[in-house]
Design a protein with these regions (language model features):
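C-terminal helical "lid" subdomain and adjoining coupling/linker elements of P-loop NTPases
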Residues: 10-19, 25-44, 140-148
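Soluble catalytic regions of large protease machineries
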Residues: 43-47, 53-168
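Alpha-helix N-cap/helix-initiation motif
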Residues: 1, 36-39, 90, 122
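Adenylate-forming
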Residues: 23, 170-171
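Single conserved hydrophobic/aromatic residue that forms the stacking wall/gate
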Residues: 1-8, 12, 169-170
Length: 171
């Protein structure tokens, strides 16, 4: 019976490892086995990812950090920080969106603090943060300056263009 229990436990562990690997492939892409980063690049990527992980861990509204990797992936990322939701979420508050912005920008901030400069490795994070910031203002009406206005749906024209330009300046 102890052997059966041990075998069942091994099967469960293997299934969990396979599931985790599948999630990582979906989120970050397939590992680039032949890609080896230079030591200095690996250090920058490590600081960058730890910036994300530390920020996510320090913000109570953020999902917990499950794994941090600095293994290059086929999708173009040199590393990633994987957060796992603890429950289903259907609504996202202003604070949660702002916290996501903090986590996205924390990798770049960590690079700047550690090395006095930033790298191109933060380009995807910067793009995603810009998208969230734009949606906060133009889609969700969460701007303290422009108020509760959904600018994304307005028809083109003089007023719509002016408000959109104003919202982009605000972002």
């Amino acid at each position: 019976t102890q052997g059966v229990s041990s075998a069942a436990s091994d099967v469960y562990k293997r299934q969990l490892q396979d599931f985790t690997a599948a999630v990582e492939r979906l989120v970050a892409g397939i590992e680039r086995k032949g890609s080896v980063l230079r030591s200095d690049e690996r250090q920058v990527v490590a600081y960058h990812e730890m910036g994300h992980a530390l920020a996510a861990s320090s913000l109570p509204a953020m999902d917990p950090v499950h794994k941090v990797s600095i293994i290059p992936r086929a999708a173009g990322s040199l590393g990633y920080t994987l957060q796992r939701p603890t429950d289903d979420r259907y609504l996202i508050s202003t604070q949660m969106l702002r916290d996501r912005l903090v986590v996205l920008m924390a990798g770049r901030a960590a690079e700047h603090l550690a090395f006095g400069q930033v790298s191109t490795g933060a380009a995807d994070d910067l793009g995603r943060a810009t998208d969230i910031a734009r949606q906060l203002v133009t889609r969700f009406g969460m701007s303290p300056v422009l108020g509760q206005a959904v600018l994304e749906r307005q028809q083109a024209g003089y007023l719509g263009d002016s408000l959109l330009r104003l919202s982009l300046i605000h972002i």
